[in-house]
Structures are given as structure tokens and as C-alpha cells.
Amino acid sequence: LDNLQDVDVAIFSACHGTPYKPGTASHAANAPAAIREALSWYSSNPEQLDLDTMKPVFSGKTVVDCGDINGSTTDGSANRQTINRTTKDILLTGSIPILIGGDDSTPIPFIEAIASQMPVVIVQIDAHIDWREEIGGERFGFSSTMRRSSEFENVRKIIQIGGRGPGSARPADLAAAQAWGVKFFSPVMFIRTGSLLSLTPFLKMPI
């Protein structure tokens, strides 16, 4: 992280967030490695033209992968502190941080770090809405990501796309999200409207 002054985007990954069962590795602990493998072609061919945008893959931007940060299967608090500190360190260089998880508890300290320095609009794409207050006494697990994020002062707007089916929330969770002002866009809404353009009014709302 000491040489990012001229870097546009800095990627780092966290294999472990806040476990519900300390000592048990996250179901998504291997995700960073899998994502890097899947994207290896793009990183090795940055000069290739992307016909969707009609621009080179990285469009002249400098992107650096900082690798995995240290994590623990037993100490969620330490993991959160490391993610938070790493994010702030990257922001201090002027680079844009991108976090690769890890389960859905890893964004909590990431969003907290960004929100400590600037207004934030969250767009979540997930089958689950993650508004549980706690599970088994743990308030920072992967089922509470959006609720915890909503508590950060600079989070101005939350749009959640893709929530579906049973198992995503209880009535109280949905009520809390709606009371906060979350805008939901479910697959059913997409089927009815036939277009993601129905999101446009949400995205154009003032921050």
C-alpha cells in the first residue's frame, strides 16, 4: 500500500469476515482466488478492446491487486479492523478501493471506512436483503450487512436489487429497511416492468 500514489484503483481481498461459528472458515473463503482465476484473462490482456464499451478493458486506468489481507476464522473483530484500516489507507493515497470477499460480512467495515470520509450510495445485488439485527447474538455477521451499513452516518441512499423467495428476511427486517427508506427492486418487479430502467428514478434521487 506504500506505492499507490499514482494508482487509480487498488484491489484487495478479505477471505474472512465475522464468523457465526468461530473457528469455522467462511463458505466463501475461497472466493477471492476463484474470482482472480476467472478474471485472469482480463488482467493479462488489458489492451484488448471491450466491444460492449468500445474501449480498452481498463481504458487507460492503472489497476493494482494488493492481494489478500491477513484474516482469522476466530476473530471477527480483528478482521473488521483490518478491512477498515486497509480501506482507509487506500483512500488516503487517492486510489479507489475495491474489496473482494469473502462472505457478505466483509463489506460492513469496508463501507464504514468509506462512509467515514464521504457520502455513500449503496447498490446491493443479492437474493437476501441482510437486515437481521443479530443472529445468535452476533450483530456483524453476513445476515446483518445492510442493517449495519444503514447505521453509518454518511450512507445516504440504499437500493437493493434481487431480493427473492423465502429465507431472506422476517417481517420485522423488511419493516426496518422500509422505514429507513430502502428502495427494493425484486425479480418480480423486473418481470412486471420488463426493464431495469424502472430503477432510474431511484438512481436520480438527490443524495
Locations of regions flagged by a protein language model:
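Conserved alpha-helical scaffold segments that buttress catalytic/binding sites
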Residues: 1-207
